């Protein structure tokens, strides 16, 4: 990519999904991830990475959390206890952004069966080329 390439302009992708059983919402998932509409290969790489991240998150919710939510819902119904839908969120926070660099972290938060759980991971990006950076390169 040439030196005059347009750097990636970062926006936000927001999406929500709900899973239901017998008309009752048992799982709610939402995400806020970086996105871009910047044309060119750098923008495409960046967009593709986080769109795949979003699909993977919702697939994880479908395959892992939805069965757990069903089990908890059925147990609550059998024991005549109140039920609250399970929650999962994927949220990104930008910590540094300039024309060349982007540093951010993403929290995956789950609340399953009343026990909160959080995993944090960080990413760094060269916005002019659209490639991830190692911590050393930041």
Mark where each language-model region is:
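Compositionally biased intrinsically disordered regions enriched in Thr/Gly
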Residues: 1-138
